[in-house]
Amino acid sequence: MKRIVPLYYVKNVLRKCYSGLLCPQLCLLCGKVSEAGLPLCSHCIQTEFEPYIGSDDLEHLCRAEPRCKHCGKILISEHEYCTCCRRTDGESAEKPRPACDRIFTLFPYIGLGQKLLPVWKNNNIRTFSTVFAPLIHSLCTQHPGLASLPLVPVPPRPKKLREKGWDQIEDLAKDLAVYPELTIYRCLKRQDGIPQKKLSKADRAVNLQGKITFSAKAVPEKLMLLDDVMTTGATLEACAHTLKAAGCKEVFGLCLFFD
């Protein structure tokens, strides 16, 4: 058993006691008391998030929508790829393949992400990681081979980390480390620069060039990047380029939200 597990359960017990006895935590979606002391209640997690993942349950599987085979966005046509990922007739056959071989995304940013991500990142409600970690674990265990891939947290900007004192992806990685099937592999570092969210799509593609570095002694053949939201995919691409330059053969991406 991982050493972090006992501390994880102690933290959960203390959070439930604090919420139940002193300061009840209200669900940010429905406004009812969250029995686990988390920012979302179990009912909203089950109804708003789990249907996007699917499960072994037939009813949930029928509600899971088809996804793009590359970026994981929900499809609105019968094509296997979304309009951004499929090659058009006019495109050159020499168009380079993405460094990130496939991306798994869980939830739409429009609606759920718009409401919850700013609260998580800007209001210091760090228990969101405890909400999302079981959902990511569920996705990984449903797809053969995913659970065996070491998860590489996308590194934050050092300036952001100094200002906030914490990083939501690192919190998420710590909660995922509780599961014995999952491995966290921290092997990337990032130099300071302009935040991606302030840039256009074209500028995002070049903003991180040379700013993501490999910091480990060894690199596995397959890795999976972990991030909170995918907009243009530029951050994942920059990280994937670095991993492949270090010798990784296949790089996947896993993001909570897609925009």
Outline where the language-model segments fall.
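Glycine-rich phosphate/pyrophosphate-handling loop used in enzymes and phosphotransfer proteins
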Residues: 1-227, 231-259
